[in-house]
Amino acid sequence: MATVDTILQGKYPAKAHARRVAEYLQAQCPGNPGVIYLESQKTRMIEDNDETMPFRQRRPFFYLSGCLLPEASLVYDVSADKLTLFIPAIDPEDVIWSGLPLSPSEAMELYDVDNVLTTPEVNATLASIASAHNGKAVAYAIQGRTSPETKFEGFQDANFTLLNGWIEQARVVKDAYEIALLRKANDISTKAHIAAIKAAKTATNEREIEGAFIATCIANGAREQSYHPIVACGENGATLHYPKNDAELTDPVTKQRKKNVLIDAGGEYRTYCADITRVIPLGGRFAQETRQIYQIVLQMQLECIAMLKDGVLWDDVHAHAHRVAIKGLLQLGILRGSEDELFEKRVSVAFFPHGLGHYLGMDTHDTGGNPNYGDKDKMFRYLRVRGHLPAGSVITVEPGIYFCRFIIEPYIKSPETSKYIDTDVLERYWSVGGVRIEDNVHVTKDGYENLTTAPKIMEEVESLAL
């Protein structure tokens, strides 16, 4: 079996991706020849400054090119099966500051394309393709992502509404190269999570832990983060997307270290994302209350991962996570009543308010999930993937239990749900904040492959935290 690094020595499979997108085009728009046109992200300047903004490549363009250059374009002639990449021409003034750019011959060696030209040749190439199809071809591009100077002269029509949707659908199922990229992002992020655990031993502030994570990612080849890291100690962990990362790890009143810290962070490798969450003890060992909640969440995750295979209904997996949570919270005495009644009344949503997971790829919340944020059923409202999971998809499995006063207190005050929550028992758990455990899982025909190897068994985590 080829190793990740061996696979990634090859070219990113841009041509195969172009053909995959073309299948959607031909299925929905048979007849006239189709031509796909995409542009990369532009270099943008920071306002009131002569520095460029951080560059993030447009994902549709990368999916069909594998190219990270700004100011580039591509054309895919579907019937001719010809993929042409256009890269910036040499700008003598820019060479002074940044050195020579990539040449067309060098680009041919790097990318899985049939031809490489420079961007001044885009319009002539489009006109030539339109002429070859006798004016019957239709150009497909993305609204708002085409330069004013780009012309589709000679085409029967230019459609700006369909292409993005086709690409988003195509991206759901990953090929072996994409799985290798996701695994590489996970491998780097695992090293960073371990570094963060070790940094927490002596850290006094959340930002020190964040710094250790980011530094380790950069040192191992993931210069960008998949998203802004979440480093949330104590009750901060009850905020799902806690943004601050600047709280002291010692309680200002008790002068004691807080019980635990939630770290939700992942590095990005060649545009592909890792998204991993771990909770670690700040005192070396988990406090009793944290340990109890951690055991429930880990059980939720393990049972849900075991359900994964081609065609599984994600709604069912999400619902199962809630049933495991209800059972665990009943055993602790936080909830009271029957499991079925608590499930039907959606009481567990007070403690597990988000969806079980989302597709993962070039975006952290990747395309193709078809969520229904208007769902009147609050258990499923924030589930980012609805429907059956296909083999080849990669999904996060990230159950959690949180003690967020803003979310839970309305349940306590409601005449309909207050009887199900024992507030005396609940009082002991506010300081836990939140526990979430998140892995990135590749769905296969008969099961799954967990791409995440960051430690999550409590004994393993404690051995690193001591």
Curated annotation (Swiss-Prot):
Belongs to the peptidase M24B family. It catalyses: Release of any N-terminal amino acid, including proline, that is linked to proline, even from a dipeptide or tripeptide. Mn(2+) 2 binds at residues 264, 275, 438. SUPFAM superfamilies: Creatinase/aminopeptidase, Creatinase/prolidase N-terminal domain. GO terms for biological process: proteolysis. The keyword Lipid metabolism does not apply. Mn(2+) 1 binds at residues 275, 398, 438. It holds the Pfam family Peptidase_M24. Its EC number is 3.4.11.9. The keyword Protease applies. This is Probable Xaa-Pro aminopeptidase pepP. Binds 2 manganese ions per subunit. Keywords: Aminopeptidase, Hydrolase, Manganese, Metal-binding, Metalloprotease, Protease. The gene is pepP. Its cofactor is Mn(2+). One of its GO terms (molecular function) is manganese ion binding. Disulfide bonds: none annotated. Catalyzes the removal of a penultimate prolyl residue from the N-termini of peptides. It comes from Aspergillus terreus (strain NIH 2624 / FGSC A1156).
